[in-house]
């Protein structure tokens, strides 16, 4: 039976594991950064691999035949490592990346730092920040007030002087997002172009309220990497792998 490492932690990763089970031997791997994560069907490992060398050794030891990368679109480190190691070992490697959002009239930034510069340049005063823990520090010196929504508390991270922290996990509905933006008198939304339906509602609510959007563009995938944008296409790719 084909043995596949599924780099997950996303709804797409869980859906793919469910679709492939029990026809393919799937080992899902989660980064372990979120407490009590939703677990996929089948065997799961949690935690990092120890860089390129650690991942290479693990793939060899576990006799993995192929790797499907269904991590978050901004999980650039593990994607770069997986692409490199699979290339070196000659293992089939596929990225399952949910379709990005259409930015529409959003101001496009290429990094958290650039997004913080846009907030300052545009003079936004009440900002809804949904870039995740890793992006908060870029806004630490901003004069604006921030509503910061994250899954877990950003321990040890520099925070903006004026802010409100909300610990919450999606999915979020349109009406709830609309009410939140209006009640908090938000004049700008800063978000990453994560794509997908689970957190799309904030963009629709912002558009309905005429709220400005600053969207951080997705990082490019490593050169030459094969990618699909649906669970079905990823399952078809796995089904086409040669059997042992």
Swiss-Prot record:
Catalytic activity: precorrin-6B + NADP(+) = precorrin-6A + NADPH + 2 H(+)
GO biological process: cobalamin biosynthetic process
Transmembrane segments: none
Keyword Oxidoreductase: yes
Pfam families named among the record's database cross-references: CbiJ (PF02571)
Pathway involvement of the protein, from the record: Cofactor biosynthesis; adenosylcobalamin biosynthesis; cob(II)yrinate a,c-diamide from precorrin-2 (aerobic route): step 6/10
PROSITE patterns referenced in this protein's UniProt entry, alphabetically: COBK_CBIJ
Keyword Ribosomal protein: no
UniProt entry keywords in alphabetical sequence: Cobalamin biosynthesis, NADP, Oxidoreductase
Enzyme Commission number(s) from the entry: 1.3.1.54
InterPro entries: Precorrin-6x_reduct
Record GO terms (molecular function): precorrin-6A reductase activity
PANTHER family noted in UniProt: COBALT-PRECORRIN-6A REDUCTASE
Similarity field: Belongs to the precorrin-6x reductase family.
Function description: Catalyzes the reduction of the macrocycle of precorrin-6X into precorrin-6Y.
Name of the protein this chain belongs to: Precorrin-6A reductase
